[in-house]
Regions:
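Extreme N-terminal, non-catalytic leader segments
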Residues: 1-13
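P-loop (Walker A) phosphate-binding loop of NTP-binding proteins
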Residues: 16-18
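Conserved lysine of the Walker
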Residues: 23
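Post-Walker A alpha-helix
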Residues: 26-27
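Post-Walker A helix-loop "phosphate-sensing" segment adjacent to the P-loop in P-loop NTPases
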Residues: 32-40
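ATP-dependent small-molecule kinase phosphotransfer cores
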Residues: 42-103, 109-113
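Conserved phosphate-donor/acceptor-positioning beta-strand/loop module used by diverse small-molecule
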Residues: 103-108, 117-133
Length: 133
């Protein structure tokens, strides 16, 4: 009988913290140091801003499309911020991990807690802002 080897899974790396803590700066440094690390592109219902590219900056959807995806359990995490939804597409991230690629998520703490419930074997890093007087 031929022996098969299971491909090693990638790692889900979740960087979270409050706004202004430096998540983006840290994630940019991680991506520069590890160029093979896949960045998870979020989905949103807000309008694209100048220079944003579908599938690179965000996946842009209508409220109706996003709510249908919520019903289909299509997100690792999601939240409604003011009048717009934001979320991390589950299938895309988990497919990359299954293919042996490591994935970086930059999200807020509430999102990280949702991801931890759905994918507890991820690596979770919480960024604490510097104390200022």
């Amino acid at each position: 009988m031929a022996q098969t080897t299971k491909k090693d899974e990638g790692i889900l790396l979740v960087v979270s913290g409050p706004s202004g803590a430096g998540k983006g700066t840290i994630c940019n440094a991680i991506r520069e140091k590890f160029p093979d690390l896949q960045y998870s592109v979020s989905m949103t219902t807000r309008d694209p801003r100048k220079g944003e590219v579908e599938g690179e900056s965000y996946f842009f959807r209508t409220n109706e499309q996003f709510e249908k995806l919520i019903e289909e359990d299509a997100f690792l995490e999601y939240a409604k911020v003011y009048d717009h939804y934001y979320g991390t597409p589950k299938k895309r991230a988990l497919d990359m991990i299954s293919d042996g690629k490591s994935v970086l998520l930059e999200i807020d703490i509430q999102g990280a807690m949702q991801v931890k419930k759905r994918y507890p074997k991820g690596v979770f890093i919480y960024i604490v802002p510097r104390y200022r007087l």
